[in-house]
Amino acid sequence: MSEEELKAAYDFCEGYKTFLDAAKTEREAVTTAVAMLEKAGYVPFDHAKQYKAGDKVYLNNRGKALIAATLGRRSVAEGVRIGVAHIDSPRLDLKPRPLYEEGEQCFLKTHYYGGIKKYQWTAIPLALHGTVIRKDGSSLSVAIGEEEGDPVFCVTDLLPHLAADQMRKTLAEGIEGEKLNILIGSAALRDDTGAEKVKVAIAKLLFEKYGIVEEDFLSAELCAVPAFKARDLGLDRSMIGAYGHDDRVCAYPILMAEIDEKSPEYTSVTILADKEETGSNGPTGMNSYFLKDFIEDLADMAGCKVRHVAANSHCFSADVNAAFDPIYGEVHERRNASYINYGVVVTKYTGARGKAGTNDATAEMMGFARRILDAEHVGWQTGELGKVDQGGGGTVAMYVSQHNIDTVDLGVPVLSMHAPFEVVAKADVYMTYRAMRAFYK
């Protein structure tokens, strides 16, 4: 990259860090993205209206997933260009009845969300985020632990002096899921002579300060996420360390590409999806029909059939891949690994074992991606998710391609993926943006 490109990359990543800090959950990501879209002139989509080239619309799916689109110069019948990333990340979700007291300390019970190494979530500062729906239907947004002066929370761990039994266990067994309980208080309510005085004190505080009663947990989506901010990493500031790179490091570039591409040849359809980390199910996941329904509305406006639009469309499934880590190089096949600072990584297939659970892009789709990226001088590489039979993973590509849409995975290589603090290179983030601009152009 030239000095000019590097400066552009570093400048671009300042906006990305701001986005990351504002969007630690899928709901916050949608709220932040909608504000960005409306500022850029996007309006809510109305399926009863007719749109023309250059019109910019968005569809908010339950506040947890989002579609943004810019109508292209060509008819929708000739296909659309789809970019999709997911905005959910591994975290600790609160159980429906989370609040309890033990040993005169108050805790919240959790059920971890997504694939985590449980031991990584102990003894780090956590913030509480989410939405509470009260009995009367009113809603309350919660974010405690992010602002200067806010309290933070944590999952405690066993001191090494008493951990002989624990340390004989495997890493997977050392911290049990049922022990990922969040410490939230220890001060008993004064003058209370009843049982569970600390829990009563915390319940009183929740009501007085936040208007939450214990029963409200039954109709809430609350989770614990790392309380730290996105930070430049390395003396050269070439990297970013943060929670939630997977997959907001792709969500932000495709959103910015959508906003910045003012007059695309083909209609651009940008999706920020939920539930990828748990299988893409539910109405806000890519295994639902909300993408198909949106394209069907576009097809109806153009007087064509949705299946014909899908067959003529292409999708870049923007999801991360595992960057080569020299400290753990034995799990990678180096000739087919992705590396930080080598640009956006195009992943033909994911899956496990014999490519189980993968989209496996066609040779024609790979050639299509090559032509687009090379034509715009985008820095790119190919990569697999580790050695054969080492493990595996999946993306939303398989759920898009089931609609007969040619799809390939493309995204940012990540170090320490799924950890509370993941690492990416700024150059790769910017090249992902440039790849999506080239695709939408």
Indicate where each model-derived feature is located.
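N-terminal hydrophobic/helix-forming segments and targeting peptides
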Residues: 1-441
